[in-house]
């Protein structure tokens, strides 16, 4: 294809031939300037804040690419860019419309071990639910390592055996509540093993089914207690709902359907894949 008449056709050819929005190539095809093309394809393609082509000109992508992925992060970037350059207001407007619907607390599934929940909340839950004595709170702490993706409860064995919450209500004589909480945070089912000697005098570990069943009941009780606790405080609920929506409910799939698009007059040798049709389907509506 040497020439085309419209910006939409140029975009179709660029996507088919180059698999991207190549404004220089589209300019050659149409004889239009890059600025003219950008104007005619407004809301069909978007200039990406902070990204330039190798020749220093603005970098553009199709709407279905730009308005998908982590659209919350993209909106923040566009808002910052628009403060410096008002032409990015169109990005802000489009991304605002593309934001996922905020979920409320009743729609958010919370579980122990979800890494978006700050360890301070886990520690607060632990102290309140297990009635951790104040003098022990310095030595019993919740830690999370992003390097190993492991939760650890430091000082989990420092609680005394006559602690009812730790060894009876939420724990057993074989696994206290802090140990079971640590397993729960690491998404492990609690297991209790006995060490026995076999016929050859060698020690080996065998699962104690009775103690494991009892500990599993305590583990379920801790999980239920956490679900009940996490939303109970209004301020905590508001903070965590906002954090969840910002961090976890932040993406939008590429979903624009351009399968119905045909390009009259375009070179029949050029074929577009379905996602490429989708990318320019919007331009057919303009």
Please provide the spans of the model-predicted regions.
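Charged, low-complexity intrinsically disordered regions
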Residues: 1-250
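Conserved pre-motif I regulatory segment
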Residues: 250-284
């Amino acid at each position: 294809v040497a020439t085309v008449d419209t910006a939409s056709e140029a975009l179709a050819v660029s996507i088919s031939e180059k698999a991207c929005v190549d404004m220089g190539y589209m300019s050659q095809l149409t004889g239009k300037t890059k600025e003219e093309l950008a104007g005619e394809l407004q809301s069909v393609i978007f200039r990406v804040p902070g990204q330039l082509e190798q020749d220093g000109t603005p970098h553009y992508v199709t709407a279905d690419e730009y308005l998908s992925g982590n659209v919350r992060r993209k909106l923040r970037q566009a808002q910052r860019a628009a403060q410096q350059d008002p032409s990015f207001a169109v990005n802000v407007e489009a991304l605002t419309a593309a934001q996922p619907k905020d979920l409320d607390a009743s729609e958010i599934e919370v579980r122990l071990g979800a890494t978006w929940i700050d360890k301070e909340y886990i520690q607060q839950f632990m102290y309140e639910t297990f009635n951790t004595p104040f003098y022990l709170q310095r030595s019993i702490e919740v830690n999370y390592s992003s390097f190993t993706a492991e939760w650890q409860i430091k000082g989990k064995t420092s609680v005394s055996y006559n602690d009812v919450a730790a060894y009876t209500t939420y724990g057993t004589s074989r696994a206290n509540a802090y140990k079971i909480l640590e397993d729960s945070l690491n998404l492990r089912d609690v297991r209790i093993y006995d060490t026995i000697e076999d016929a050859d005098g060698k020690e080996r570990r065998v699962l104690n089914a009775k103690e494991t069943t009892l500990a599993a009941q305590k583990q379920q009780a801790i999980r239920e207690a956490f679900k009940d606790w996490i939303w109970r405080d209004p301020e905590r609920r508001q903070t965590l709902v906002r954090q969840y929506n910002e961090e976890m409910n932040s993406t939008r799939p590429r979903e624009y359907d351009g399968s119905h698009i045909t390009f009259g007059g375009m070179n029949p040798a050029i074929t577009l894949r379905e996602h490429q049709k989708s990318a320019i389907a919007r331009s057919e509506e303009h």
